[in-house]
Amino acid sequence: MNMAESHLNPVERTAAPAGTQDAAHGRPLAPLNAKIEVNNLNFFYNKFHALKNINLRIPEGKVTAFIGPSGCGKSTLLRTFNKMFALYPEQRAEGEILMDGENLLTTKRDISLLRARIGMVFQKPTPFPMSIYDNIAFGVKMFEKLTRSEMDDRVEWALTKAALWNEVKDKLGQSGYGLSGGQQQRLCIARGIAIRPEVLLLDEPCSALDPISTGRIEELIAELKSDYTVVIVTHNMQQAARCSDYTAYMYLGELIEFGETEKIFIKPVRKETEDYITGRFG
């Protein structure tokens, strides 16, 4: 790193996806196919400054992973995309999160409609206290009026996409609580995609799962990117390397480096990124 680079802030020294780097200034430019554009995003828990001037472009139809040590802000950043913070008056976001040119932070659009476009799956499997069938149908009924036959087709479609249909097709009337942890997480993914969102957010989706269930979820993530833009938060760097096309490394609320996953893991631009990936830090 030369002397001029050493005085740039972390975002200005960010590595952007191939073909998107402004060589003159070292700043990331928006990919032509960016699905979400984050501009000068700051986030606060009361007076605590949790995210600091984040600038990031999430490529469409790809899997983007957020990595970094606990408390670095990766889950906070993920949850700003569908305004989960709106539930808590002491939390606020400033800046822009653009999707199709619309700033999601200031839009007057009904928040439930926003979350229909940007689905989310949480760290711990959270099936609803109802049947497997109704877990899938519940969200669909909020946004669409389908006949019973159409709903049956949608339920089968979502469970098939989540690689769960063959395991539950004969017990759709049974409680989702009766499924294994891995099956419950796939049920939650099926529930998320049943309303046909454009973006799917996954917050540590495998942290509570065994290795076999984790492998199935990772295979599913690879398949889902053909239809969705996927953003995943993970503490597991091997998982990020296996599953994602792009990776963002965060530390203390700042975006340190962002780029193609292979380049981030093999030849990162920032020493901080290299130290974290190689286990010398974090």
UniProtKB/Swiss-Prot annotation:
CC per GO annotation: plasma membrane
Keywords annotated in UniProt: ATP-binding, Cell inner membrane, Cell membrane, Membrane, Nucleotide-binding, Phosphate transport, Translocase, Transport
Membrane topology (UniProt): Peripheral membrane protein
Catalytic activity: phosphate(out) + ATP + H2O = ADP + 2 phosphate(in) + H(+)
GO molecular function: ATP binding; ATP hydrolysis activity; ATPase-coupled phosphate ion transmembrane transporter activity
Main location: membrane
Region of interest (Disordered), ranges: 1-26
Membrane-crossing residue ranges in chain numbering: none
CDD domains: ABC_PstB_phosphate_transporter
Binding-site list for ATP: 68-75
Single Gene Ontology BP annotation: phosphate ion transmembrane transport
Localization: Cell inner membrane
Protein EC: 7.3.2.1
InterPro entries xrefs: AAA+_ATPase, ABC_transporter-like_ATP-bd, ABC_transporter-like_CS, P-loop_NTPase, PstB-like
Disulfide bridge map: none
Domain ABC transporter: 36-277
Any Pfam family: ABC_tran
Recorded family membership: Belongs to the ABC transporter superfamily. Phosphate importer (TC 3.A.1.7) family.
Physiological role: Part of the ABC transporter complex PstSACB involved in phosphate import. Responsible for energy coupling to the transport system.
Assembly and oligomerization: The complex is composed of two ATP-binding proteins (PstB), two transmembrane proteins (PstC and PstA) and a solute-binding protein (PstS).
The protein's name: Phosphate import ATP-binding protein PstB
Record organism: Burkholderia orbicola (strain AU 1054)
Gene: pstB
